[in-house]
Amino acid sequence: MMYHIPGVLSPQDVARFREQLEQAEWVDGRVTTGAQGAQVKNNQQVDTRSTLYAALQNEVLNAVNQHALFFAAALPRTLSTPLFNRYQNNETYGFHVDGAVRSHPQNGWMRTDLSATLFLSDPQSYDGGELVVNDTFGQHRVKLPAGDLVLYPSSSLHCVTPVTRGVRVASFMWIQSMIRDDKKRAMLFELDNNIQSLKSRYGENEEILSLLNLYHNLLREWSEI
């Protein structure tokens, strides 16, 4: 399943990020890619050795960790270190699949269950640059407002179309979920959404408490921590 997570960053935060990223050191994006991806990748990334990068990636981690909808959809166990990329002048990233595991500075290795892109450019400011994701439900083309995030299974083939006008800047990361299976995670997300909707409509009652108990028992049964 694919999820649109709105408002991860406020417009003020986005503007500040963009201003700081104008001063960043950018390097060839292929430095973080395996052999298959390097053949189809043509973009730039912020140098991960810079002081600015360390500050910005911490802000992204804090923002997603505090977003209730992100947590409900991803049920994250481990988040990768966020990266930042830039596309301009017809730069693109052809269809590829993300690696199943990635190194992690604290945990050694992590499994990539979900991929996330946090958009940092106004969609009207550039042409092209759509994230295209192929999954079991078909093909999805994504170009979200700045500050919004898209979450999708890392097992999906995906690409970024050429940016023919302007500049597309984004942050991206991977998530190891407490729930490995996409279908089970989607069921928990739907159940959680319905519980929250019923609580807002009717307040606390025995039926809602029973559903909440069911949610946590399923989470207890399926989670890997």
Swiss-Prot record:
CC cofactor note: Binds 1 Fe(2+) ion per subunit.
Pfam families assigned: 2OG-FeII_Oxy_3, PKHD_C
Disulfide bond annotation, renumbered to this chain: none
GO biological process terms held by the UniProt record: DNA damage response; intracellular iron ion homeostasis
Species for this entry: Escherichia coli O139:H28 (strain E24377A / ETEC)
SUPFAM superfamilies registered for this protein in UniProt: Clavaminate synthase-like
Transmembrane segment boundaries: none
InterPro entries reported in the protein's UniProt record: Oxoglu/Fe-dep_dioxygenase_dom, PKHD_C, PKHD_hydroxylase, Pro_4_hyd_alph, Pro_4_hyd_alph_FE2OG_OXY
Molecular function per GO: 2-oxoglutarate-dependent dioxygenase activity; iron ion binding; L-ascorbic acid binding
Presence of keyword Oxidoreductase: yes
Keyword flag Thylakoid: no
Required cofactor(s): Fe(2+); L-ascorbate
EC number: 1.14.11.-
Protein known as: PKHD-type hydroxylase YbiX
Binding residues annotated for 2-oxoglutarate, in chain numbering: R168
Entry keywords, A to Z: Dioxygenase, Iron, Metal-binding, Oxidoreductase, Vitamin C
Residues noted as binding Fe cation in the record, renumbered to the chain: H96, D98, H158
Domain Fe2OG dioxygenase: 78-177
